[in-house]
Curated annotation (Swiss-Prot):
GO MF terms, alphabetically ordered: ATP binding; ATP hydrolysis activity; ATPase-coupled transmembrane transporter activity
Keywords of this entry: ATP-binding, Cell membrane, Membrane, Nucleotide-binding, Repeat, Translocase, Transport
Name used for this protein in its record: Putative ABC transporter ATP-binding protein MM_1996
Family: Belongs to the ABC transporter superfamily.
Gene3D superfamilies registered for this protein in UniProt: P-loop containing nucleotide triphosphate hydrolases
Natural source organism: Methanosarcina mazei (strain ATCC BAA-159 / DSM 3647 / Goe1 / Go1 / JCM 11833 / OCM 88)
PANTHER family in alphabetical order: ENERGY-COUPLING FACTOR TRANSPORTER ATP-BINDING PROTEIN ECFA1, HEAVY METAL TRANSPORTER
Residue ranges, annotated region (Disordered): 287-309
Cellular location(s): Cell membrane
Domain of life: Archaea
Keyword Repeat: yes
Protein task: Probably part of an ABC transporter complex. Responsible for energy coupling to the transport system.
């Protein structure tokens, strides 16, 4: 916690805003004060207005928007409505939700130097600021790289560096680590916390991945339907779990576990949880540990048997990249069978997105071959797979060009001359919970809603093979589970890239782990998650509940399994009523 808090640096009063083309008001009477040096986590369901609120801090709204705006926003005592964006940008730096919306330079160096150059700094000072900023985000070795060659997580690092080079008083960050691997996320968050503590920079960070940000935050603010409904110190916020549950927000696993077991505490890590399990009567109830494993529960997504099942996708010795001198994939061998749900995980830049592009026939192998439905992608026109493969890019905006979400869902079926276009569009929009937005302009929606629009646009063609690149980005827990449940219920063949190991464990029948262009693990989630060496190589970490279960000597991979194991060991344990494990 930063002890150097000063006067109020952000003051928002009765803020209202409605986007052009939207019937519903996005921000509804927001009142918020943030003191200098605070680290504030802003969260809430997808589409509740978080990103819009951030855009008001540096004047993007209302100066670059034609929407309906009213209210007052003061940054360091300056009214944003009366100030130019150049002046505001010196005080409030904004890291966008999508790095592709922010990056416009051709090289990493030019992107990071742009801000200091516009502040008319000397060349020597600019070079030092670029060096320092890239070092802080772990991108020093990429200074001369093309921004187009970077992975999504690397682009996010560059966007953060471009703001750090200007050292603003306020750093407003919109899901800045959503495309980073877990190790990279912790690295960046540690850097941000150091800046908060040592430089007294005020941090306002929007994120759905509450479990990763909560340990760093002084304060938690929750929005819903354009309003602030909870504003409390981080140490107190999780005493109101019913609010998180009602809104479908993911609570840190240790907090959920302690609440389930009736322990009055809100630990954010496995390490903080261990001492709580050693206290008083609770230790007597769960017995001495480690002990013999508790009851072994079946996994949420059992392993897949490929016996007597011809592969839908067959990859042999695949070498692929965007430049012959720099291969991204190096000797990939892989089979995917009908009905499998395969999670692809690994470090940023390990080749996950490149693998998906090859499976979509959008890239052709430099060496080796990829066969989809038995057809070699080297000899087939990519358009021949249209209607059979549904692909959603990491950045959904690359796919959205129609004037409404309904038109997006109709576009594919219309081009393919399919029947029942209206019904197909309705079903796909309904499946993604955006039927109520069918007349809305996609560009006016939140990133999570835009991503679900992109998914709906491929569901309407009913593809045989579904490929999703980071489908959990910008999504709250309810929408993630609803999307993945849809594919699970339909028995879809699904390959999805993700850094979310909990979602991979819950929904994937199989997990591939990649590192430096190669598959280093391929198996059931339970088996992969136990291999600490593999996880370390891929910059992945075990979920806290798995660490806690191991500490207790129980073979469990979810809170439900862990609690069942504890009850099996000692039936006298009482579970808090009404808690959803």
């Amino acid at each position: 916690m930063n002890q150097n808090r000063g006067s109020t640096i952000i003051e928002i009063r009765d803020l209202w805003y409605t986007y052009p083309g939207r019937a519903e008001t996005t921000l509804k009477g927001i009142d918020l004060k943030i003191k200098e040096g605070e680290f504030v986590l802003l969260t809430g369901p997808t589409g509740c207005g978080k990103s819009t609120l951030l855009k008001t801090l540096n004047g993007i709204i209302p100066h670059e928007s034609e929407g309906i705006f009213s209210g007052s926003i003061k940054i360091s005592g300056i009214e944003t409505v009366d100030s130019g964006q150049m002046e505001l940008s010196k005080k409030a730096g904004l890291v966008f939700q999508s790095p592709d919306d922010q990056i416009f330079s051709t090289t990493v160096e030019d992107e990071v130097a742009f801000g200091p150059e516009n502040l008319c700094m000397e060349r020597e000072e600019i070079d030092k600021k670029v060096d320092d900023a890239l070092k802080m985000v772990g991108m020093s070795g990429h200074r001369l790289d093309s921004t187009n060659s970077l992975s999504g997580g690397q682009k996010q690092r560059v966007c953060i560096a471009s703001m750090l080079a200007m050292m603003p008083e306020i750093l407003a960050m919109d899901e800045p680590v959503s495309q980073m691997d877990p190790a990279g996320t912790q690295e960046i968050l540690n850097t941000v916390r150091e800046l908060n503590r040592k430089q007294n920079i005020t941090i306002l960070l929007v994120e759905h991945r509450i479990h990763e940000i909560a340990p760093f935050a002084d304060r938690v603010v929750i929005m819903d339907s354009g309003k602030i409904i909870l504003d409390q110190p981080a140490s107190k916020a999780f005493e109101n779990l019913e609010v998180f549950h009602r809104l479908g927000l993911r609570v840190p696993e240790p907090v959920e576990l302690c609440h389930t077991l009736g322990i009055k505490a809100s630990p954010f890590s496995a390490e903080e949880t261990f001492p709580l399990l050693n206290t008083g009567n609770f230790k007597e109830k769960i017995g001495d540990y480690p002990a013999s494993p508790g009851r072994k529960e079946k996994t949420s997504s059992p392993g897949w048997s490929s016996e007597n099942n011809e592969p839908l996708v067959s990859v042999r010795d695949l070498w692929s990249g965007y430049d012959k001198s720099r291969m991204v994939l190096k000797g990939i061998n892989l089979e995917i069978h009908r009905g499998e749900r395969v999670a692809v995980m690994g470090t940023n830049g390990s080749g996950k997105s490149t693998l998906l592009l090859n499976l979509a026939a959008m890239l052709r192998p430099y060496k080796g071959n990829v066969k989809i439905f038995g057809e070699d992608t080297k000899t087939k026109n990519p358009y021949s797979f249209a209607g059979r493969i549904g692909f959603v890019f990491q950045n959904p905006d690359l796919m959205l060009f129609c004037d409404s979400t309904e038109e997006e869902a109709k576009f594919g079926p219309a081009r393919l001359k399919l029947d029942n276009i209206e019904e197909r569009a309705k079903i796909s929009l309904e499946a993604m919970s955006i039927l109520n937005l069918r007349k809305d302009l996609p560009q006016s929606l939140s990133r999570g809603q835009r991503l679900r629009t992109a998914v709906a646009s491929i569901l309407s063609i009913d593809p045989i093979l579904v490929l999703l690149d980071e489908p959990t980005t910008g999504q709250d827990r309810v929408n993630i589970e609803q999307m993945m449940d849809y594919f699970k219920t339909r028995g879809s063949t699904l390959v999805f890239c993700t850094h979310d190991i909990e979602i991979a464990m819950l929904y994937a029948t199989r997990i591939l782990v990649m590192n430096e262009g190669q598959i280093i693990a391929d198996g059931r989630g339970r088996d992969v998650i136990k291999d600490i060496d593999i996880l370390r190589k891929a910059s992945l970490t075990q979920p806290p509940v798995v660490e806690i279960a191991s500490y207790l000597g129980i073979d469990a991979f979810s809170i439900t399994e862990l609690v069942d194991g504890l009850i099996h060991r000692n039936p006298e344990i009482r579970i808090a009523e009404g808690i959803k494990c």
